[in-house]
């Protein structure tokens, strides 16, 4: 009887010790995961570092050299809601995802379309904006052309290296030649100069370029190609960051702030005198 009681006591003590160890391990792991989240890093640092590239009207320099546009507005609002400062880190598009993965900044907020191929490397929030691509053509070089005529070895497109339009052009117009540049402005300039027949970009960029250069450029088709959503991009294995950014986006979709801000930059022209 005494032996049995002693054995039961040993077994009970071992079980309790195991439970205590498991609880301690779980608590330690949870604390470790929380501490590793970029959200905790931002809070401790007091600054959120946002990677972006420059393209109108997502983000651009005004006459004083300051960043303005939809993305700076989103980034400033996000930082204010988190109670931290914001640091924008302009980065060329082709290297922006590698820079995020390398820890150069905390999140990409730069009109990045959510795609399965990008999702292999980074996680995306829910979309905070939606847009489509349109063709911007050199009027004289493409006069009388139908859409299918653009898929020809005699046609040259230009695009911003690493951006969604480059991939779309290669898939939609595989026979056409493709020139790649680091900025949308350089891509558009090739069309203006007559070195490329057309380029593609997200609206309202093409329509604005056509209005600024009515003698040379036009948007030949009233079609939004490859319409999709843009999300915040963040490093993998960070559920806290994903949860926070999603909740922030849902909140400001609900309040209407995101729509109002998007409409200001994409549907209006009150801001043009800041940059022209």
Predicted features along the sequence, with ranges:
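Acidic, polar ligand-binding/catalytic clefts
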Residues: 76, 80, 85-151, 217-218, ...
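Short helix-initiation/N-cap motifs at beta->coil->alpha
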Residues: 36, 88-98, 143-145, 161, ...
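Extracytoplasmic small-molecule ligand-binding "clamshell" domains
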Residues: 28-111, 120
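A ligand-binding cleft/hinge motif common to bilobed small-molecule-binding domains
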Residues: 95-98, 112-120, 168-171, 192-226
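Extended ligand-binding regions for polar small-molecule ligands
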Residues: 28-33, 72-81, 141, 148, ...
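N-terminal export leaders
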Residues: 5-9
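Periplasmic-binding protein-like
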Residues: 130-137, 203, 207-250, 268-276
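Bilobed "Venus flytrap"/periplasmic-binding protein-like clamshell domains
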Residues: 49, 53-57, 67-80, 113, ...
